[in-house]
């Protein structure tokens, strides 16, 4: 699939790290480093603008290494970029650790997954069909 992209950063386009990767690493595009204090959040620019085909979205997800090693994650995970959005792709990061974290220019801060989606059409009914699970949720099926 081809996706139109404008790269206003000085960094490479988002790229797959391996042949079978689902997500492309996306980089911070900063004029100076950002220091994220514990529990602080910020909007990080990437310098990337995309035009997705109709029926697709881009999901912005955390990078597992940053999450486990540094406590840095995408706050609205997954963030959704709609096919009709034409602004700069920016990433909302939060520092969940107890230590400050410095985001450097060019650092891989998140991953982007391109996915198909459908738009639902609501069908109002009076009663939903029965299932084995029923209304059970929030830990209903076992521990955790």
Curated annotation (Swiss-Prot):
EC number(s) reported in the record: 3.6.1.23
Record's catalysed reaction(s): dUTP + H2O = dUMP + diphosphate + H(+)
The entry's keywords: Hydrolase, Magnesium, Metal-binding, Nucleotide metabolism
Family: Belongs to the dUTPase family.
Residues that bind substrate: 63-65, 76, 80-82
BP GO terms, sorted: dUMP biosynthetic process; dUTP catabolic process
Protein name according to UniProt: Deoxyuridine 5'-triphosphate nucleotidohydrolase
InterPro entries: dUTPase (IPR008181), dUTPase-like (IPR029054), dUTPase-like_sf (IPR036157), dUTPase_trimeric (IPR033704)
Pathway named in the protein's UniProt entry: Pyrimidine metabolism; dUMP biosynthesis; dUMP from dCTP (dUTP route): step 2/2
Organism, scientific name: Bacteroides thetaiotaomicron (strain ATCC 29148 / DSM 2079 / JCM 5827 / CCUG 10774 / NCTC 10582 / VPI-5482 / E50)
GO molecular function: dUTP diphosphatase activity; magnesium ion binding
């Amino acid at each position: 699939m081809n996706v139109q992209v404008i790269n206003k950063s000085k960094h490479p386009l988002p790229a797959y790290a391996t042949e079978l990767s689902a997500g492309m690493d996306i980089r911070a595009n900063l004029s100076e480093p950002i220091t994220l204090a514990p529990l602080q959040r910020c909007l990080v620019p990437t310098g990337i603008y995309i035009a997705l085909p109709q029926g697709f979205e881009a999901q912005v997800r955390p990078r597992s290494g940053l999450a486990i090693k540094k406590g840095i994650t995408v706050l609205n995970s997954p963030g959704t970029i709609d096919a009709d959005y034409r602004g700069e792709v920016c990433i909302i990061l939060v520092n969940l650790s107890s230590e400050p974290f410095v985001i450097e220019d060019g650092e891989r801060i998140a991953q982007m997954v391109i996915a198909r989606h459908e738009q639902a059409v609501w069908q109002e009914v009076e009663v939903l069909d029965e299932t084995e699970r029923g209304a059970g949720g929030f830990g209903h099926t076992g521990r955790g």
